[in-house]
Amino acid sequence: YSLSIYDSVLTSIPESAIACEAEFRLAEIQYRVMEDFDKALNLYKSSLSKCRSKTLKEQNILRIADVHLAKGDFISSIKFLDSSYSIHDIPEIKNKLIEMYLFSGLPDTALTMINNSFKTIIPTNKYFNDLMELRDFINHYYVKIDAEGKEVFKNYLRSESLLKQRKIFEANQLLEYIQNNNNNEIISPLISLRRSIILIRLKKYNEALSQLSTLNGSIYSDRGIIMSGQIYEQFYGDPSKALEYYMRIINDYSDSIFSEPIRYHLRKIKNNEKI
């Protein structure tokens, strides 16, 4: 129904500002829902060529890059963002370019761009914290580890790019391969956490629980415990078992950033039991 409405708008007023936005909305449906990347790409490009709104121009540019990534065409995505950034000096485009370099398996280039960004932005900039977190992430899992570990991290990035291409089964297979061939203890918890999330999406809950159990003693211990509780609560319908996991956060991980949200969630569960 939505598709027919947008198509009629495009037919009746092809050069109007309304048509520009309608094309963008239709492209969103093709990209996010229908997953027809070729049609979405054509619509985003058409909308971009008509738009006068800076906001809509930016949205189209970022989406065109996303669609190229979804198609696995990193080169086109990077070239397009590079040329767009030379015309539109917009931070969001540069940040998207950093993302594309990272997921195309070029963390060194992404890190160089991040470090260059810190030369021109101040701590109050709205992107400062995000860039800082990304820099720390790359430093921890790539810069500070050996050559073998660096290759493992690049394979992890490839699995992330597969997810962005909607290839969830292939991403899971790649992560499983990494686990079976990886001896780097630093990156192992990251791989297990990411694979557990994918296994939940694939409704393989027992396998996900097995992955989450390996996170004990790692920097992701609290997340593993919480996610295990969520599996029992949301998918197995076992709130009593879920409470056991949630109480471990309260008792053993009181300093966790998740402790207060878990306290609040526990109160909700107990209130629901009273009803």
Where do the protein language model's features map onto the residues?
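Acidic, polar-rich low-complexity tracts and alpha-helical solenoid repeat scaffolds
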Residues: Y1-I275
